[in-house]
């Protein structure tokens, strides 16, 4: 049996009370390929701030941020630092 992978997703928008909670646990089979894709709005409204937090709990109990989260955060910081005319 493969390692236990548990992931919890939480999404919300700034001025909205709508929340999406999804929690799932599965046991990948040896050699099984897992692909997770996320899609975001290309041009979100200025008053809307999408927030997405993903936490992966490894079988040893440690939490790690996904590489995608780190890349998205870096991209967001670069975008907010660039001033447009």
From Swiss-Prot:
Biased composition annotated in UniProt, kind: Low complexity: 44-59
GO biological process: symbiont-mediated suppression of host innate immune response
Record membrane topology: Lipid-anchor
Keyword field: Host cell membrane, Host membrane, Host-virus interaction, Inhibition of host innate immune response by virus, Lipoprotein, Membrane, Myristate, Suppressor of RNA silencing, Viral immunoevasion
GO CC terms: host cell plasma membrane; membrane
Residue positions of covalent lipid attachment, annotated as N-myristoyl glycine: 2
Coiled-coil portions: none
Main location: host cell
Subcellular location: Host cell membrane
Record's keyword annotation contains Lipoprotein: yes
Family matches, as InterPro entries: Gemini_C4
Spans annotated as Disordered: 42-65
Main function: Pathogenicity determinant. May act as a suppressor of RNA-mediated gene silencing, also known as post-transcriptional gene silencing (PTGS), a mechanism of plant viral defense that limits the accumulation of viral RNAs.
Stated family: Belongs to the geminiviridae protein AC4/C4 family.
Entry protein name: Protein C4
């Amino acid at each position: 049996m493969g390692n236990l992978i548990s992931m919890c997703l939480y999404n919300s928008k700034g001025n909205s009370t709508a929340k999406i909670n999804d929690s799932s646990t599965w046991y990948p089979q040896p050699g099984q390929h897992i692909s997770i894709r996320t899609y975001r709005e290309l041009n979100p409204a200025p008053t809307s701030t999408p927030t997405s937090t993903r936490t992966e709990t490894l079988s040893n109990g440690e939490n790690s941020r996904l590489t995608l989260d780190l890349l998205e955060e870096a991209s967001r910081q670069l975008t907010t630092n660039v001033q447009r005319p």
